[in-house]
Swiss-Prot record:
Residues 1-28 are annotated as: Disordered. Transmembrane segments: none annotated. InterPro entries: FUS1 (IPR029393). Residues 7-20 have a biased composition (Basic and acidic residues). It comes from Caenorhabditis elegans. This is Uncharacterized protein C09E9.1. Pfam families: TUSC2. One of its GO terms (biological process) is regulation of mitochondrial membrane potential. GO terms for cellular component: mitochondrion. Belongs to the TUSC2 family.
Length: 123
């Protein structure tokens, strides 16, 4: 649903750019090429690029109207002459939001072998 001239045209990449190990362009590189370059940096320099780390994630906790923080909230209810039972509260809760990690963690979908164990050669 747009005009024919509203689409942006991409320019072909320049062939004269030198290929370096440490720098990766995200805009022009395909994801598999980018991962391969990062893996090469990991092998040659022994460092872990920032691309493989997660600094914050969505929290699974909720905040109720009193400001208490928990994964689930329950309320004890009792009707006329019945047993007491716990009912899960679903109303008036808001998600905690994103949580920043004190120590960055590895992404779960890294397609690179970070540590490889080799069997000792018997002579």
């Amino acid at each position: 649903m747009g005009l024919g001239s509203s689409k942006r045209k991409e320019e072909p990449p320049h062939k004269s750019e030198p290929k370096t190990v440490g720098r990766v362009k995200r805009a022009g590189a395909r994801p598999d090429e980018m991962i391969a370059k990062y893996a090469e940096v990991l092998k040659t320099r022994g460092i872990l690029p920032e691309y493989f780390l997660v600094h914050e994630a969505k929290s699974s906790q909720y905040i109720d109207e009193d400001g208490d923080v928990a994964n689930e909230f329950y309320q004890e209810t009792m009707s006329d002459g019945e047993k007491r039972r716990l009912c899960r509260l679903m109303k008036n809760l808001r998600p905690k939001g994103k949580e920043r990690y004190a120590i960055p963690r590895l992404k779960h979908d890294i397609p690179v072998v970070i540590w490889e164990v080799q069997q000792p050669q018997e002579t």
